[in-house]
């Protein structure tokens, strides 16, 4: 029987829960990052997720996560231990990320950024340099040269920017972020103008930043897009070599497997 891993990307907007085998991430689910949730509430939600996937607690070999919300860590640890009988192993805390961290203050780097950079390094070994572009709550660019994490850039995120615009403008509709293959650059209504502004605006952000990074990072260099809006932006931009929406979950899977071999 295949070994299954339960993977957690604990972010500011959602807790992304992935189910993986040793070879691949099979599927993922999103739970809201809810400050009122309890450990038992998370545990019951995890059982529902596994039931939907046709799995039980006995099918899970390990729970592995990455967190940028420290207040949720003890709740999810409780959920895993009580309901799945497995400890939650957190990247950068319980599982070191095997990259040389060249940040001026290494502890300032979010575990999510390190794990995504590590995943890109392992998935694309032929590239000397890699840039991971994560379209999450923030839009982050993380750079790797060989086995060294160099740092990167943190820019506004798609959802946070859309939410800020909607909350400060009385007459503007909410942004839908819908993408079609033949969408024109120029919107002809307020709704399409907003939608196209965000899609093409963030595509231009990615193109501009990656073009600058290509001037300072060694070749061969490959750019990997990830996060919830990676596919939408990639449909209107050719600056990405790869699109891996579950890059961080893949990184957690690989991190755990490497730790088992040490």
Swiss-Prot record:
Entry's Gene Ontology cellular component terms: cytoplasm
GO molecular function, one term: ATP binding
Documented EC number(s): 2.7.1.33
Binding site for substrate: 103, 110-113, 190
Cofactor binding note from Swiss-Prot or TrEMBL: A monovalent cation. Ammonium or potassium.
Cellular compartment(s): Cytoplasm
Active site: 112 (proton acceptor)
Pfam families tied to this protein: Pan_kinase (PF03309)
Keyword annotations of the record: ATP-binding, Coenzyme A biosynthesis, Cytoplasm, Kinase, Metal-binding, Nucleotide-binding, Potassium, Transferase
Catalytic activity: (R)-pantothenate + ATP = (R)-4'-phosphopantothenate + ADP + H(+)
InterPro entries to which the protein is assigned, alphabetical: ATPase_NBD, Type_III_PanK
Cofactor: NH4(+); K(+)
Keyword Cytoplasm: yes
Primary location group: cytoplasm
Binding site for ATP: 9-16, 137
Gene Ontology biological process terms, A to Z: coenzyme A biosynthetic process
Name of the top EC class for this enzyme: transferase
UniProt pathway: Cofactor biosynthesis; coenzyme A biosynthesis; CoA from (R)-pantothenate: step 1/5
Annotated positions binding K(+): 134
Family assignment from sequence similarity: Belongs to the type III pantothenate kinase family.
Subunit: Homodimer.
Function: Catalyzes the phosphorylation of pantothenate (Pan), the first step in CoA biosynthesis.
NCBIfam families: baf, PRK13321.1
Protein name: Type III pantothenate kinase
UniProt lineage: Bacteria, Pseudomonadati, Thermodesulfobacteriota, Desulfovibrionia, Desulfovibrionales
